[in-house]
UniProtKB/Swiss-Prot annotation:
Gene Ontology, cellular component aspect: nucleus
Function: Transcription activator involved in the activation of cuticular wax biosynthesis under drought stress. Binds directly to the promoters of genes involved in cuticular wax biosynthesis. Transactivates WSD1, KCS2/DAISY, CER1, CER2, FAR3 and ECR genes. Functions together with MYB96 in the activation of cuticular wax biosynthesis.
Induction comment: Induced by salt stress, osmotic shock and abscisic acid (ABA).
MF (Gene Ontology): DNA-binding transcription factor activity; sequence-specific DNA binding; transcription cis-regulatory region binding
Gene responsible for this protein: MYB94
Tissue: Expressed in germinating seeds, rosette and cauline leaves, flower buds, open flowers, stems and developing siliques.
PROSITE patterns linked to this entry: HTH_MYB
Domain HTH myb-type: 9-65, 66-116
Predominant place of localization: nucleus
Residue ranges of the annotated DNA-binding region, renumbered to this chain: 37-61, 89-112
Name of the protein in its database record: Transcription factor MYB94
Organism this protein belongs to: Arabidopsis thaliana (Mouse-ear cress)
InterPro entries on file: Homeodomain-like_sf, Myb_dom, Myb_TF_plants, SANT/Myb
């Protein structure tokens, strides 16, 4: 249970102090000084306990006690010390020597506690409002960034799809087999040896689509322009080597057609027929020296004008006409 309070003893007075009791206490302390509170009631004759004498001196009678309202600095000190020390009012009063612990406790319970509660409520509301505004701004920012990211993602996906389609198209174009841009349909004349074969031998050349290649593949018509182009291309691309006999025979027949533009229609049919006859190839094999000499002359010439000069040379012209007349007779028979 602990020891009983000293005020409960028999003959000990309780209640408020009288002015006479205050004068006796102050006179004794001025003579002997504060301290040894247990001997004060015995030496002074006061019917008070030692604790009551100490509190009366400390809280009311000692010199330097400040009365009246608390300043702002004192309020801040009390709030700070109460937060650190709690309700230890005597320890708090030691930091404020002009204020008593009883005055500090009473002021705390009547004023500062309510004021602190209001301050905390206002701070909480301000913090909550700030957090709400911050959350709202963050949510708006996140929404905006999400929308922008979605839009940028959509643009990126469309760009990626376009790049993929372009890459696939380029790959297909690269892997596809080149198709001739100028499809040419032609028919080779009948190589029969009947009497009507020479009269029914025709060459049909049909060219569709636009002519983008200056030297299109296919069979040329018997014209001087096409023959000149073929010979010019042959001079640029063909290396200086011996030409195979079939190619030489074909070139020989083409030069014959170009050198005799004034021949009759019947002669033209015979020449066209000789282009595709095997007799011309056989005769070319029988005359390799002459053909090689002509082809080498064709290759060594530097321009088309020199070739034309050689083409219309009288001796070469007579030789080619004689050969072609022999070939025409063999085809007819």
């Amino acid at each position: 249970m602990g020891r009983p309070p000293c005020c409960d003893k028999i003959g000990v007075k309780k209640g408020p102090w009288t002015p006479e009791e205050d004068i006796i206490l102050v006179s004794y302390i001025q003579e002997h000084g504060p301290g040894n509170w247990r001997s004060v009631p015995t030496h002074t004759g006061l019917r008070r306990c030692s604790k009551s004498c100490r509190l009366r001196w400390t809280n009311y009678l000692r010199p330097g006690i400040k009365r009246g309202n608390f300043t702002e600095h004192e309020e801040k000190m009390i709030l700070h010390l109460q937060a650190l020390l709690g309700n230890r009012w005597a320890a708090i009063a030691s930091y404020l020597p002009e204020r008593t612990d009883n005055d500090i406790k009473n002021y705390w319970n009547t004023h500062l506690k309510k004021k602190l509660k209001k301050m905390n409520d206002s701070c909480d509301s301000t913090i909550n409002n700030g957090l709400d505004n911050k959350d709202f701004s963050i949510s708006n920012k996140n929404t905006t960034s999400h929308q922008s990211s979605n839009s940028s993602k959509g643009q990126w996906e469309r760009r990626l799809q376009t790049d993929i389609n372009m890459a696939k198209q380029a790959l297909c174009d690269a892997l596809s087999i080149d198709k001739p841009q100028n499809p040419t349909n032609f028919s080779i004349p009948d190589l029969g040896y009947g009497p009507s074969s020479s009269s029914s031998s025709t060459t049909t050349t049909t060219t569709t689509t636009r002519n983008t290649n200056p030297y299109p593949s296919g069979v040329y018509a018997s014209s001087a322009e096409n023959i000149a182009r073929l010979l010019q291309n042959f001079m640029k691309d063909t290396p200086k080597t011996s030409v195979p006999l079939p190619v030489a025979a074909t070139e020989m027949a083409i030069t014959t057609a170009a050198s005799s533009p004034s021949t009759t229609e019947g002669d033209g049919e015979g020449i066209d027929h000789s282009l595709f006859s095997f007799n011309s190839i056989d005769e070319a094999e029988e005359k390799p020296k002459l053909i090689d000499h002509d082809i080498n002359g064709l290759i060594t010439q530097g321009s088309l004008s020199l070739f034309e000069k050689w083409l219309f040379d009288e001796q070469s012209h007579d030789m080619i006409i004689n050969n072609m007349s022999l070939e025409g007779q063999e085809v007819l028979f």
